[in-house]
Regions:
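Local sequence-structure signature of Cys/Sec-based thiol-disulfide redox active-site neighborhoods
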Residues: 1-24
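Thiol-based oxidoreductase modules, predominantly thioredoxin-like and allied folds used
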Residues: 5-6, 25-40
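Short, surface-exposed acidic/glycine-rich loop or hinge patches that mediate macromolecular interfaces
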Residues: 8-11, 36, 69
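Residue-level recognition of oxygen-bearing side chains
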Residues: 16, 40, 71
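Chalcogenol-based redox active-site neighborhoods
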Residues: 44-45, 72
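Structural micro-motif
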Residues: 45-54
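Non-catalytic, surface beta->alpha helical segment in thiol-disulfide oxidoreductase systems
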Residues: 55-80
Length: 80
């Protein structure tokens, strides 16, 4: 399992989410994806807004999605 974090440098909620993630011990690795630098990947996942977290299985199958700035509690509940 891994988490894809879709964000952009100009996105204030993305920066707040990154600070929240930095303070957490997550059960899965997080891969940061800048939608401006990797628009094809953002399109492949149908990203319509940032920040967006996508949980993937080891086979690359999407297990869940969380859109917008979220609290630590929201993120941990989503991952459980």
């Amino acid at each position: 399992m891994k988490v894809l974090k879709f964000s952009a440098e100009w996105c204030a909620p993305c920066k707040m989410l990154q600070k929240t993630l930095d303070e957490m011990v997550l059960p899965y690795p997080v891969e940061n994806i800048d939608i401006d630098k990797q628009p094809d990947l953002a399109g492949e996942f149908g990203i319509r807004g940032v920040p967006t977290l996508v949980l993937l299985t080891g086979e690359g199958v999407e297990q869940g999605r969380l859109v917008g700035g979220k609290s630590k509690a929201d993120i941990m509940e989503w991952l459980s």
